[in-house]
């Protein structure tokens, strides 16, 4: 299996919280300083954008409390607006001014929550980013309605940074290039958005990329030919994906290529997945020890953020900060940024990345685009649990392993606690409904069946 996993919200959240609280040294325990945020300038508009951007994809929920590793939280559907307001206020007061949302985030509720929180502040004090998330219904009428609804939900008359969402993917009826044409070209939506930019309703127009390199290259060729000027582009980048994204998943493109192509054209890069959905904050103990040996006072997550921030072509690096502890720790990494040395970059991209690659997990970032499953399965919850056990080093099917009985019981008991039995992997019928919805292009039915077979084997070896 040639797949490497991405930590998930519940598991990664716990890891980050533990890391924030247990780090040695006063730097990680003090409140982040005010007035020290590092900013990057948009070369076209001269916007001063905070190097840390707030990703509004995993907002705090009512009753969520402190996440417990490997467990799904109750009350996931209800966003805790009071906590969102508090965290947005804290972020703004510490210099964060870029807020990234989308119509599909938080099961359609993120834009409203984001708009509610930001409406209480002066509009010129922040930059709003949202997206044309017309993955399911991409007629002109449905797409323009989505755009207008974003303005309504965000309670604004203009969008600072607007993106074509998830270009490069495919669906049951379209190959990647065909889907790009259907979603944005044939229906006239790109022309519509270009007109909105002329009118000032959109201030900067770009796209976010997942998937087929040919589509990425095609969109940049449009820029080169003068057909469309892309003001910015959002890509996945971190010290693991820099050279290993394609090895992790053959559908992915190495970040070094994506970033390099943008640099050639002077297009600012907005970074998503700097932590691989939390994966680079939830590292195995041997890897953590190596990071702590070099900088005991720094959190594990700070290495990943400093890596992204050390690239001069990065406009902002997005982080989905569910908990206040996440926000505070990330602020310490950017207030101000202390760039990595060239030697540290090489170490992260090379030896450390290769060690992380040896932990073979599933590349799920818990985005929940695959949900709801028509048969009621908790797909991301199943992957969350599996990845957590892998990262703990407790996954084994070797009967001769002296820890086998302990690890076997741990997996089965924690699986039943994390995911209700009726929603577990053994109920997957392989319908494929989820396949075109996954931006990571995971073969979800295959992975569900693999986990189901593994669990059956554990149960048989009682």
Predicted features by range, described:
Residues 392-431, 460-462:
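Short Fe-S-cluster ligation motifs
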Residues 2-126, 157, 192, 198:
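N-terminal binding-site loop/beta-alpha segment at the start of enzyme catalytic domains
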Residues 42, 54, 91, 99, ...:
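Conserved, mostly hydrophobic/aromatic
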């Amino acid at each position: 299996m040639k797949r490497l996993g991405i930590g998930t919200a519940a598991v990664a959240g716990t890891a980050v919280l533990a890391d924030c609280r247990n780090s040695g040294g006063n730097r990680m325990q003090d409140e982040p300083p005010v007035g020290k945020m590092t900013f990057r300038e948009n070369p076209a508009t001269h916007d001063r954008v905070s190097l840390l951007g707030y990703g509004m994809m995993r907002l705090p929920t009512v009753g969520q409390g402190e996440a417990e590793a490997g467990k799904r939280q109750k009350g996931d559907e209800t966003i805790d607006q009071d906590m969102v307001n508090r965290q947005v206020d804290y972020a703004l007061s510490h210099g964060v001014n870029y807020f990234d949302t989308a119509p599909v985030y938080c099961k359609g509720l993120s834009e409203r929550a984001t708009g509610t929180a930001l409406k209480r502040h002066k509009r010129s004090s922040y930059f709003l980013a949202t997206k044309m998330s017309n993955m399911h219904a991409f007629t002109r009428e449905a797409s323009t309605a989505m755009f207008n609804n974003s303005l309504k939900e965000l309670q604004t008359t203009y969008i600072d940074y607007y993106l074509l969402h998830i270009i490069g993917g495919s669906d049951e009826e379209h190959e990647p290039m065909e889907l790009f044409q259907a979603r944005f070209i044939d229906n006239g939506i790109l022309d519509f958005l270009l007109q909105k930019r002329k009118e000032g309703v959109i201030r900067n127009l770009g796209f976010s990329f997942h998937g087929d390199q040919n589509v990425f290259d095609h969109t940049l060729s449009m820029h080169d030919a003068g057909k469309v000027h892309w003001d910015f582009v959002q890509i996945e980048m971190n010290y693991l994906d820099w050279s290993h994204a394609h090895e992790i998943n053959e559908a992915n493109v190495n970040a070094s290529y994506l970033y390099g192509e943008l640099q050639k054209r002077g297009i600012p890069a907005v970074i998503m997945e700097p932590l691989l959905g939390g994966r680079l904050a939830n590292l195995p103990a041997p890897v953590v020890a190596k990071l702590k040996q070099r900088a005991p006072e720094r959190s594990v997550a700070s290495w990943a953020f400093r890596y992204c921030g050390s690239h001069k072509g990065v406009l902002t690096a997005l982080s989905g900060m569910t908990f206040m502890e996440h926000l505070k720790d990330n602020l310490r990494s950017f207030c101000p940024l202390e760039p990595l040395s060239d030697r540290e970059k090489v170490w992260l991209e090379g030896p450390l990345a290769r060690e992380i690659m040896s932990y073979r997990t599933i590349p799920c970032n818990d985005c929940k685009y695959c949900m709801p499953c028509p048969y009621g399965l908790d797909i991301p919850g199943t992957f969350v649990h599996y990845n957590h056990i892998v990262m703990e080093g407790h996954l084994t099917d070797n009967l001769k392993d002296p820890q086998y009985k302990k690890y076997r019981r741990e997996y089965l008991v924690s699986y039943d606690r994390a995911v209700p039995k009726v929603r577990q992997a053994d109920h997957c019928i392989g319908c494929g409904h989820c396949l075109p919805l996954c931006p990571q292009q995971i073969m979800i039915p295959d992975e569900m069946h693999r986990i189901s077979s593994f669990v059956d084997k554990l149960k048989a070896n009682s």
